[in-house]
């Protein structure tokens, strides 16, 4: 008789465990997707509002296309640092680069 009284409690406990496990897995998948940065290619980025000033559809589409081309062809603003200079121990000055191989000016 004791088992019949505990049956609703057991069902509620199992239901609670299943819902918390499902919520935990749902949060885990959302968390992993949120940490991955969304990198959108510049070509597919939303166009600037300046193209909305064109009333003709052809001019507006050309403006959007030119903005996409311009946005995707941008170069990074920083350049790599120059290599460190080497000091020649013999002369105490900076080493110079000397080309190797045959002289291209000599026939």
UniProtKB/Swiss-Prot annotation:
GO BP annotations listed: cell-cell signaling involved in cell fate commitment; maintenance of root meristem identity; phloem development; regulation of cell differentiation
Location of the region described as Disordered in the Swiss-Prot/TrEMBL record: 73-107
Gene Ontology molecular function terms on file: receptor serine/threonine kinase binding
InterPro entries with a match to the protein in the record: CLE9-13
Keyword flag rRNA-binding: no
Superkingdom, natural source: Eukaryota
Glycosylation sites (chain numbering): 27, 30, 102
Keywords, comma-separated and alphabetical: Developmental protein, Differentiation, Glycoprotein, Hydroxylation, Secreted, Signal
GO cellular component labels: apoplast
Signal peptide: 1-23
Residue stretches of biased makeup (Basic and acidic residues): 87-97
Modified residues annotated as Hydroxyproline in this record: 99, 102
PANTHER family in UniProt: CLAVATA3/ESR (CLE)-RELATED PROTEIN 10, CLAVATA3_ESR (CLE)-RELATED PROTEIN 10
Homology family: Belongs to the CLV3/ESR signal peptide family.
Name under which the protein is recorded: CLAVATA3/ESR (CLE)-related protein 10
Native source species: Arabidopsis thaliana
């Amino acid at each position: 008789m004791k088992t019949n009284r505990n049956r609703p409690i057991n069902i509620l406990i199992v239901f609670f465990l299943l819902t918390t496990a499902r919520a935990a897995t749902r949060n885990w998948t959302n968390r992993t997707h949120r940490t991955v940065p969304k990198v959108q290619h510049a070509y597919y980025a939303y166009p600037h509002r300046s193209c909305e000033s064109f009333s003709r559809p052809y001019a507006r589409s050309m403006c959007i296309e030119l903005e996409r081309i311009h946005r995707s062809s941008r170069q990074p603003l920083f350049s790599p640092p120059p290599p460190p200079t080497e000091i020649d121990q013999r002369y105490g000055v900076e080493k110079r680069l000397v080309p190797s191989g045959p002289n291209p000016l000599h026939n």
